[in-house]
Amino acid sequence: MKIGTQATSLAVLHNQESHAPQAPIAVRPEPAHAIPEIPLDLAIRPRTRGIHPFLAMTLGDKGCASSSGVSLEDDSHTQVSLSDFSVASRDVNHNNICAGLSTEWLVMSSDGDAESRMDHLDYNGEGQSRGSERHQVYNDALRAALSNDDEAPFFTASTAVIEDAGFSLRREPKTVHASGGSAQLGQTVAHDVAQSGRKHLLSLRFANVQGHAIACSCEGSQFKLFDPNLGEFQSSRSAAPQLIKGLIDHYNSLNYDVACVNEFRVS
């Protein structure tokens, strides 16, 4: 889920991140909802059989931590600086609709430049309302999947928002695990996504079973990645592993340990 922020504050989702970095950010928790302990394998292959539907809905791809007030520079937990790759730093996810915004970014990832895309997706932009509509498709599909006892409701919901945007899946969704650390995870994901002509909706799944949707596109030798909480990043294809590692390290440093990445290749 999205952690809402103001200028220099980072709120804590469901009071689960009380150990989030304290400086230079003041931590203010949102109203807490108790979430029972869930087995980690739900993050790896998100099955919800036996999980209360309300809980499963809270675990969908809605966002997690905003960039507002969060430095993208190197710290003790990361060796890759996201700021080296940032081309349009913007938090457009205050409305908690990361799956919808990421899908909308994929639709127009080849149009204009990074700043114009962020303007499109920002609060006064047409893309914000479209992203909200797309995210409603995601939520509706997730609810339907849960009511039908779907064993992979998050995959079903992601597929629904992809198809609603006019895309189709090029292959079955793929899950890449983080067992080898962020460098290996970044390398493995980049091998799949940083190929010319490929577009992906990606779902970061965290150890607390929360999810966050981002998107990426590779055109020629240029790799572009969009995170609704942080904005747009660009690199060469060869540097894509470092960019993805930097993003993973960013969330790990906020105690959102990335357990796996679900890949949805679209065309």
From Swiss-Prot:
It is an enzyme of class 3 (hydrolase). It comes from the Bacteria. The record marks 62-63 as: Cleavage. Keywords: Autocatalytic cleavage, Host membrane, Hydrolase, Hypersensitive response elicitation, Lipoprotein, Membrane, Myristate, Protease, Secreted, Thiol protease, Virulence. Coiled coil: none annotated. Its main location: secreted. It is found in: Secreted; Host membrane. One of its GO terms (biological process) is proteolysis. Its EC number is 3.4.22.-. One of its GO terms (molecular function) is cysteine-type endopeptidase activity. GO terms for cellular component: extracellular region; host cell membrane; membrane. A lipid is attached at residue 63 (N-myristoyl glycine). Autocleaved. This function is essential for myristoylation in infected plant cell and for eliciting the plant hypersensitive response. The active site is at residues 98, 212, 227. Belongs to the peptidase C58 family. In infected plant cells, the 28 kDa product interacts with PBS1. Cysteine protease avirulence protein, which is essential during infection of plant cells from cultivar-specific of beans and Arabidopsis thaliana. The autocleavage of the protein is required for virulence function. May act by affecting the plant defense system. In plants lacking R3 or RPS5 resistance genes, it probably impairs the plant defense system and leads to the bacteria multiplication. In contrast, in plants containing the R3 or RPS5 protein, it is unable to induce disease symptoms, explaining its avirulence name. This is Cysteine protease avirulence protein AvrPphB. It comes from Pseudomonas savastanoi pv. phaseolicola.
